[in-house]
């Protein structure tokens, strides 16, 4: 069984990390929420995962896009991507990574949702893949380990690599 639902994938990741999961739409103004979250996170030291629904690259609120705000606040971002039926990814995936890099966003990497995880193909993508969430029976330890390593790399100010 594959996780085809981003919300379920985020819940799974939050459970693995022991994190609080918040879900928001991209129509909300990003800066007030990020200001509140960063102060709460600083005070509690608890890991918080924020799942955004909608187009994070579009300024829906009139106060800047979520991508721009996340970059400005230096908040680490993990992108989730579903493969097409043929196993390849739509052009929006590398375009989103390029946009994130142009904004100097703290990109932890990409997680594939569902489909067959093909490491050689993911390496040829040249994208910062961390792993795949295929279903509730999977062992996500490799993905979690990759994400923890990428977080440490970002904390040291180094660039994250690819699979």
Locations of regions flagged by a protein language model:
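C-terminal-of-GTPase-core extension/linker across diverse P-loop GTPases
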Residues: 152-163
């Amino acid at each position: 069984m594959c996780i085809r639902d981003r919300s379920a994938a985020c819940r799974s990741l939050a459970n693995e990390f022991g994190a609080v999961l918040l879900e928001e739409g991209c129509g909300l103004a990003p800066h007030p929420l990020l200001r509140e979250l960063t102060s709460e996170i600083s005070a509690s030291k608890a890991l918080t995962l924020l799942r955004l629904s909608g187009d994070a690259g579009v300024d829906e609120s009139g106060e800047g896009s979520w991508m721009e705000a996340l970059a400005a606040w230096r908040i680490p971002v993990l992108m989730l991507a579903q493969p097409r039926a043929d196993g390849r990814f739509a052009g929006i995936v590398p375009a989103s990574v390029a946009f994130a890099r142009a904004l100097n966003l703290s990109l932890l990497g990409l997680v594939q949702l569902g489909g067959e995880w093909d490491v050689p193909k993911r390496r040829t993508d040249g994208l910062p893949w961390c792993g795949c969430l295929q279903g509730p029976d999977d062992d996500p330890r490799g993905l979690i380990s990759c994400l923890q390593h990428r977080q440490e790399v970002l904390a040291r100010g180094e660039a994250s690599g690819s699979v």
